[in-house]
Structure formats: C-alpha cells, structure tokens
Amino acid sequence: MTARLGARGAVELIRAHDGIVHRCLADFAGREVKHTGDGMMAVFPDSKRGVDCAIRIQREFHHYNQHAQEPIHIRIGLDSGEPIEDSNDLFGTTVQLAARLCAEAEKDQILVSETVAREHGDTFAENLV
C-alpha cells in the first residue's frame, strides 16, 4: 500500500480506516486491544455487540467506498468466548480462531465461528449488505 500510495497517502487511508472503526467500536462499547498495522483486534462486553459492530463496520466501509478515490476493503473474523488478558493483550483459543477467520475472509466479508453463527445467525441473515 505504501509503495502504491506513498507514505502520506497510506497514512491518510489508515486514518480513514481507524476513524470509521473507532466510531463503530464506541457505538457498541467495543475496545481496541491492539493495532496490527493493517488491522486491529477488539473486544466487546458480549457477542451481540460484537456482531452488531461488525455489521455496522461492513456497512460504513461499503458507504465510504462508494465515494472514495481509494477504497478500503476489510475482513472481519468473529468468535465468542473468554480470552485470557495479560499485559494489555488478549490470548487464547477465541483470539486465535477469530484471527484465523479474519485471515480466511474474502474482502468485505465477515466470517464467524460456529458458536457465533449458532447464537446470532439470524442477525446476519437480516442485515445482508
């Protein structure tokens, strides 16, 4: 991205991304755990808020991309469970599965674990972008 857009262009794109995601996190009581350079890990008080936030993020980027010179494509992976918190970071199978789902997602796609699908599958069916 930096090679294509230059340092300034890449920073502007990251700021646009982070602005959208941070607004959505705030709306659903989400908390950024860490920025991974090309994405971020977040945690929510409950899985419903995580699902609703993911859908809002997807919609916000869809809207952003309709008017953007440089579109931003996102991938989201969701799992539900109790991660282990240590040194301001999260660990455990929930975190690992969410990361794997994110890595497997196509651009602009939300992939969820079986647990999330079982608990909130209807929410996704009702909110297709």
Predicted regions: what they are:
Residues M1-C53, E60:
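Catalytic NTP-binding/metal-coordinating core of nucleotidyl cyclase/transferase enzymes
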Residues I55, A99-R100, R118:
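Active-site phosphate/pyrophosphate- and oxyanion-stabilizing loops and adjacent acidic/basic residues
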Residues R56-R59, A103:
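Short, intrinsically disordered, mixed-charge
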Residues R49, Q58-A68, I72-I74:
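Helix-adjacent hinge/juxtasegments
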Residues F91-Q96:
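Charged helix-capping and loop-helix junction motifs
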